[in-house]
Amino acid sequence: MSTKSKAYKAAAELVDRSRLYRPIEAAKLAKETSSKNFDATVDVVFRLGVDPRKADQLVRGTVSLPHGTGKDVRVAVFAEGDNAEAAKAAGADIVGTEELIAAINEGNIDFDVAIATPDQMAKVGRVARVLGPRGLMPNPKTGTVTADVTKAVADVKGGKISFRVDKASNLHAIIGKASFDAEKLAENYGALYDEIIRLKPSSAKGIYAKKITISTTSGPGIPVDASVEKNYTD
């Protein structure tokens, strides 16, 4: 058995599969079961009671995590003129249009989030088939198509994340790093949970949040009590 699998097995044995953990308990356990070799990302997966094939049940949105993600998010902005200057001043990592499109077509996608001003969307459409499957296509619904690039860049850099349910009805998101205090992880989780619950489609029947799991990179999944609302740090 490899050292990695031994470490995973030891970590997995700390998780009681017969129970559901409160968010703060899951956050503490995620930190405890995380790799000690690097600062792992803490992820959460929601299994939702929706049918993503139906347009009115495609749960997607954005939320600003109160403590950010702990990740250095690289932002690309499709803009020209004054908007391009504003994006640069706000801290965007890559700004441009034609040169950015050319780089994308060459396979150089060195960013985590793409933002575009409305007047550039016709041009951005030329790389939609590249950006779309990667979840990088700017979209008005996520606030990434906007004339206010200063605010958009600041929001993303400050911890605003986008989420979307996938074809298997799972919704994945990052809520921080293993180095975060457990309370901060729980509060980030709570902000995400509240927004997902708020977005429950009226046509979705039965249990909405069927299953929630928190884990770190390469760490075991920790089942979370989906009935816990508010008081996430208790």
UniProtKB/Swiss-Prot annotation:
The keyword Plastid does not apply. One of its GO terms (cellular component) is large ribosomal subunit. Keywords: Repressor, Ribonucleoprotein, Ribosomal protein, RNA-binding, rRNA-binding, Translation regulation, tRNA-binding. The keyword Cell wall biogenesis/degradation does not apply. It comes from the Bacteria. Pfam families: Ribosomal_L1. InterPro entries: Ribosom_uL1_bac-type, Ribosomal_uL1, Ribosomal_uL1-like, Ribosomal_uL1/biogenesis, Ribosomal_uL1_3-a/b-sand, Ribosomal_uL1_CS. One of its GO terms (biological process) is translation. GO terms for molecular function: rRNA binding; structural constituent of ribosome; tRNA binding. Part of the 50S ribosomal subunit. PANTHER family: 54S RIBOSOMAL PROTEIN L1, MITOCHONDRIAL, LARGE RIBOSOMAL SUBUNIT PROTEIN UL1M. Belongs to the universal ribosomal protein uL1 family. Binds directly to 23S rRNA. The L1 stalk is quite mobile in the ribosome, and is involved in E site tRNA release. Protein L1 is also a translational repressor protein, it controls the translation of the L11 operon by binding to its mRNA. This is Large ribosomal subunit protein uL1.
